[in-house]
Amino acid sequence: MTEQVDATMPIQFTDAAAIKVKGLLEEEQNPELKLRVYVTGGGCSGFQYGFTFDEKVNEGDFTIEKQGVQLVVDPMSLQYLVGGEVDYTSGLEGSRFFVKNPNATTTCGCGASFSV
């Protein structure tokens, strides 16, 4: 497990995302849960982002702690997310976690899939 807490982090975890995760964990009443972000093949642009809650941190996972909650990324996914930012938005279009990814050369209209 690798944990970094300075500006050299390969991926950022915004306050908005951390605050939302904290609220969801309080609803679940399980402080052991962490937000895991991952990349899989699929979607209309070749790769897609996924988000899930996970109690486990695997060997080699990258973790960031903010607002008392953790974001976890597996090593394979991290290579596609370096320089990116995990954020949360809520508005007229709904509420969702999303990734701002500078490595994505194209994205689909909803922002859930990308290509590099």
Swiss-Prot record:
Q: What Gene3D superfamilies is this protein classified in?
A: HesB-like domain
Alphabetical GO biological process terms: iron-sulfur cluster assembly
- Which InterPro entries does this one have? FeS_biogenesis, FeS_cluster_insertion, FeS_cluster_insertion_CS, FeS_cluster_insertion_RrpA, HesB-like_dom_sf
Q: Which cofactors go with this protein?
A: iron-sulfur cluster
Q: Does the keyword Metal-binding apply?
A: yes
GO cellular-component term (any): cytosol
**MF term (GO), any:** 2 iron, 2 sulfur cluster binding
- Keywords noted in UniProt: Iron, Iron-sulfur, Metal-binding
The UniProt note on the cofactor reads as follows: Binds 1 iron-sulfur cluster per subunit.
Organism superkingdom = Bacteria
**Iron-sulfur as UniProt keyword:** yes
Q: Summarize where iron-sulfur cluster binds, as residue positions.
A: 44, 108, 110
Q: What does this protein do?
A: Required for insertion of 4Fe-4S clusters for at least IspG.
Q: Tell me the NCBIfam families matching this sequence.
A: iron-sulfur cluster assembly accessory protein, PRK13623.1
User: What family, per the record?
Assistant: Belongs to the HesB/IscA family.
Tell me the subunit arrangement: Homodimer.
Q: What is this protein called?
A: Iron-sulfur cluster insertion protein ErpA
Q: Which organism is it from?
A: Shewanella frigidimarina (strain NCIMB 400)
Protein's gene: erpA
